[in-house]
Each structure stands twice: as structure tokens, then as C-alpha cells.
Amino acid sequence: MKILDWSQLDGAAQTDALTRPVQTVAARTRDAVAALIADVRTRGDAALREITAHFDGVSLDSFAVSEAEFAAAEAAVPPELRQAMQDAVARIDTFHRAGMSGGYAVETAPGVVCEKIVRPIGRVGLYVPAGSAPLPSTALMLGVPARLAGCREVVLCTPPRKDGSVDPAVLVAARLTGVRRVFKLGGAQAIAAMAYGTESLPSCDKLFGPGNSYVTEAKQQVAQSGAAAIDMPAGPSEVLVIADAGAQPAFVAADLLSQAEHGPDSQVLLLSDSDALIGAVRAQLEVQLAQLSRADIARQALAQSRLIKVQTLDEAFAISNRYAPEHLILALREPRGWLAQVEAAGSVFLGDYTPEALGDYCSGTNHVLPTSGAARAYSGVSVASFQNMVSVQAASKAGIDGIGACALVLARAEGLDAHANAVALRMGVAA
């Protein structure tokens, strides 16, 4: 990893230091995804079979996972893994249940009541990537809030393996959260199928889940077309660590590597006011890399990442807020005291004993988070992500008589005569 001194960089160099590996979508990626989506919309399952054979190397007669396959998955998953997933589900449920809203009602004027009522989204589609490794934890993170929200139907897509099966742990994770319909589909084609529907898959109202640049681009394209809403831009993973001189170099290095091993397009950043800490972390990276099975992938990610020396921790937080990381680790002596300075981050991890990996798996928070700077305006997945808040209002005759004059003045100011007339008729006055 490159070591940079922030104070020695001009504006352009600072911008370059914070640029993600996948900051923009290449035109060819955009065009390829658009063509794939159009093919799925036109030819349905036939297109899915051809695309799956080409990209996943397997020919499928049926995309739906059968009951026999679910049973085989249950038998294949080791008891300790199943128990770990059950424990994670319990904590994810506890955290997400605590944040649920039941709506509210308020009388805004005598005889005028305004409400918010909560309704589940009817049918949702969950995407669980497999890429270089299956991610059953993502099935847990999406399935639990979908269940709590009360969605009528939940569909899950995950890429098939070369033998036409799906990773058993993903199937068990799906069942643990109540998901019954799982399809062997990956990539942009899965997004297209869930958005528009095919002979095998129903069209969904909203799509959830992370993925590579093709999946992220597909989600954005189907959302722009109005076919399905999406949770957020959720692309390659990233972490930013702010560490002081008292941080443990081995811990910091381990946190950086835990994100770097996700893929070559991941990005990890360290900001510290301590030259000694930066040097020690750099040395620890080499020590720990030698022990990793995915060292080659991690090295590719580290080649595009930075160790940045700052003058003060205040400067570090200013940089972090500008970057708006998916994951932000505060390896500081008084981490909670600095929390007030965090303005934009998907999820924050406080102190030396809160590795980002806990949030990935089992602390209870959700690991489906905004990336690529989207944390400035988006939040991570929650139960509310799977619900609609519907506005309701009711006015009595006394109510409209009391506030109608306000509506008349505003309607006339906007030149909307029919609006004014709809109020005036009920009030028994001239529009």
C-alpha cells in the first residue's frame, strides 16, 4: 500500500487518493448490461438459460431450487455452521425489531387528523452474490428484515455452481429467515429476471442486495426504467480506518485485509496521525498476507489502497466524511467521544475490539450498506427498507372550514383553479 502525507498533496492529488477503483461504469459495461436486460425482457427463461450457460458454465432445466435440494443442503451443512447462523439470526432479529416503527397520528388542527401507516412491500427480490465465495450471511441480512416487515412474497436469487447446485449454506440461511423461493440465477440476469419477471420468476416490486459492478449497474438500470425500486447502490466493499498512536497494528492490519480479501475492486484506507502506527501496520500487512488463502486477491485490492498520514484526527474525520465509507472503524482511545464527528458512513465500529467482521456476520446490524460514497445520502438495509409509509388524512366539516382558507390562498397563488374549487365547494364559499 502507498503511504501518503495528506498535507503534501494538492487538491487534485487528494481527490485521486480517495478515488475508488470502480468509480465510474465503463460504457461497455453499461451497454452490455442494457443488452442483457433487453434479452431477458424479450425472451424470458430462454435467455436466462443461454446467459447462465455462458457465464456460469452450467445448463439448467429448472431455475427453482427444489424441496429435495433444500433437504440435501440441510444434511450437508455442519451443525456448528447451522448453529452459528441461528445465533446470528437471533441477534439480527433483535436489532432490527428494535428499530421498527408502527406509524403515528397527529391532529394538526381541530378536526384535521394526519397519519402515517406502515404497509409491507408486496413482493421483494433478494440477491445473494457468490462471486469468488458464497455469502450465506447476506441471505440472513436480507431475509430477517423482509420477514419482520411482513412482505407477502420473498424471492431470492443466487448464482449456481458448476454442477448446477447452490451453496448449501445459502439455502439453509434462506430457510432460517423464512425464505421459501430460491432461484439459481446470478449476475445482471438475475436482477433483470426479478425486475421484469419470466416464465419461472415473478416480477418484484423492490430489489435488494450487493453485487459486482454488473449487478450494481443492472439494479440502477431497472430502477431508472421504473420496473422495480432498489435498496441502494451497493457495489464493491470498502473500509476506512481512523487510528491513533495507541491502536494495535495487528488489529488494524487484520481489519484492512478482511475487506481487501472480498475482491480486487475493494478499497481499504487507513488515516492516522502517527507515522509509527502507519509503519507498523504496513509491516503487519505483509506478515498476515502470508497466512491468507486469498492473499492474491487481497494484494490486488491493496495495490489500489492507501495509508494516509494526517496532521490531526480532526483532519482525518473531515477526510472520512468526504469519502463517506461503507465501513468506518474508529481504532481510537476514546472512540465514542469522536462519534459526533461522523457525518457520513454506512456502519461505524468503535474501539479495538469491534472488528468490521462482527458487523458482517453476527453483531446484529445489517451488512448491506451503501458504497462508493452513497453513504452521504443512503442508509443501510433495515425493516423500513421493506415497507412503505403511507400518508393518511381525514378532515371533518369543521376541519375544512378551519384550514380551507389556507388552501384557497395557496391554490390561487399557484393558479390552480380546480384545486381551489375542490376546497371552496366543501366550505360553501366562492373559489
From Swiss-Prot:
GO terms for cellular component: cytosol. Keywords: Amino-acid biosynthesis, Histidine biosynthesis, Metal-binding, NAD, Oxidoreductase, Zinc. Coiled coil: none annotated. Binds 1 zinc ion per subunit. It is an enzyme of class 1 (oxidoreductase). Its cofactor is Zn(2+). Substrate binds at residues 237, 259, 262, 327, 360, 414, 419. This is Histidinol dehydrogenase. The lineage of its organism: Bacteria, Pseudomonadati, Pseudomonadota, Gammaproteobacteria, Lysobacterales. The gene is hisD.
